[in-house]
Every structure is written in structure tokens, then in C-alpha cells.
Amino acid sequence: MEFKHVLMILGVIILTLAPLIMYSGLGEDEGYFGGADGAAGDLIMEISPNYEPWFEPFWEPPSGEIESLLFALQAAIGAMIIGYFFGYNKAKYDDKN
């Protein structure tokens, strides 16, 4: 395996493990990883308690786990599309050379 591939693999491992090590167990009870939607909703209610949303979602997932699953599925589909694009362009470039 080439040295640049080893460096890339090590970089991915470090980038994956660094947040897990840095934030292991910190802030879970305070909603540290709560998300932007919840924080924005809380801020809107703090600024204007009488605010009423313009519309409601037509379907809401029955649990947080299903919501996370749908989000992960959306991310996986996006990653597959991006990976296909890069693979297609690399194969096209290799065919020219």
C-alpha cells in the first residue's frame, strides 16, 4: 500500500475518533447534541412567546430513532450519489489516458 493511502486512512481514523474522545459523556444530559431545530424553536419562543408556526409537518416520525434512521438514510443516499459522481469521473479520466 502506498504511503499516501496509509496517511489518508490514518487521517480518517483520527478525524473519526477525535470527537468521540473529546466529548465522551460530556453534555449529554444538557442536550449538548440537541440539534439546531430544537435550539431555534426554543429561541423563537423566548423572543416571541405568542408566535404560531405557519404550518405543521404532514407526518412526524413516531420516535427519535426513526427520525435518526431517516436522516442517516438521507445522508447515505447523498454519499452514494457523490461517490458515483467521483467514480464516474475517475473512470472517464482513466479511459482518456
Swiss-Prot record:
According to its UniProt entry, this protein's organism is: Methanococcus maripaludis (strain C6 / ATCC BAA-1332)
Q: Which gene encodes it?
A: cbiN
Q: Name one GO cellular component term.
A: plasma membrane
UniProt-recorded Gene Ontology molecular function terms: cobalt ion transmembrane transporter activity
Q: What is the lineage of its organism?
A: Archaea, Methanobacteriati, Methanobacteriota, Methanomada group, Methanococci
- Subunit composition? Forms an energy-coupling factor (ECF) transporter complex composed of an ATP-binding protein (A component, CbiO), a transmembrane protein (T component, CbiQ) and 2 possible substrate-capture proteins (S components, CbiM and CbiN) of unknown stoichimetry.
Single GO BP term = cobalamin biosynthetic process
Protein name per UniProt: Cobalt transport protein CbiN
Output the superkingdom of the source species.
Archaea
Which keywords accompany this UniProt record? Cell membrane, Cobalamin biosynthesis, Cobalt, Cobalt transport, Ion transport, Membrane, Transmembrane, Transmembrane helix, Transport
* One Pfam family matching this protein: CbiN
Q: How does it sit in the membrane?
A: Multi-pass membrane protein
